[in-house]
C-alpha cells in the first residue's frame, strides 16, 4: 500500500485522469459526483467500469487486484486506456497488457511512475502546441 501512496503523491488525480480517454475521465467524474476532489475510490470504481470497453476480462482484473491492489490496478488500466490511443504501436490486447503488467509487478519490474511521467510529458507537448 505504501507504493500506491507514492504514486498518488507524484501525479495529481486531476491531472492523471486527463491522460486517458474522455470515456475514462467521464466515468471517474461520475463517481466523483459533487465532491471537490477525486478520491481513490472514485478512480478505482471508474476504472472498473472501463473493463468491458477496454476488453479486459474479469479474471485478468481480479488477478491484477490480488497482486497489485485496487489503486495500482486502476492506474494500470488508465495507462492501458491512454496507450490504446497511441499513433505508434497502440495496445492491441489490453487484457494481455494487464496480465503482463501484473507479472512485471510480481517480479518487481513494473515502472508505473515512468509510464505516468511519459504520459504527462506527452500531454504537456499536446497542450504546448494546442492539440489538447
Question: Which residues are covered by each model-predicted region?
Answer:
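Electrostatic interaction modules used in gene-expression and signaling proteins
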Residues: 1-132
Amino acid at each position: 500500500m505504501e507504493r500506491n501512496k507514492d504514486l498518488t503523491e507524484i501525479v495529481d488525480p486531476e491531472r492523471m485522469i486527463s491522460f486517458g480517454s474522455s470515456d475514462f475521465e467521464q466515468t471517474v467524474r461520475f463517481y466523483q459526483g459533487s465532491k471537490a476532489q477525486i478520491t481513490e475510490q472514485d478512480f478505482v470504481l471508474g476504472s472498473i467500469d472501463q473493463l468491458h470497453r477496454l476488453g479486459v476480462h474479469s479474471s485478468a482484473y481480479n488477478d491484477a487486484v490480488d497482486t497489485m491492489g485496487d489503486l495500482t490496478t486502476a492506474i494500470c488500466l488508465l495507462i492501458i486506456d491512454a496507450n490504446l490511443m497511441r499513433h505508434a504501436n497502440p495496445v492491441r490486447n489490453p487484457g494481455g497488457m494487464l496480465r503482463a503488467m501484473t507479472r512485471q509487478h510480481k517480479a518487481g519490474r513494473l515502472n508505473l511512475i515512468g509510464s505516468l511521467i511519459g504520459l504527462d510529458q506527452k500531454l504537456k507537448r499536446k497542450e504546448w502546441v494546442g492539440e489538447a
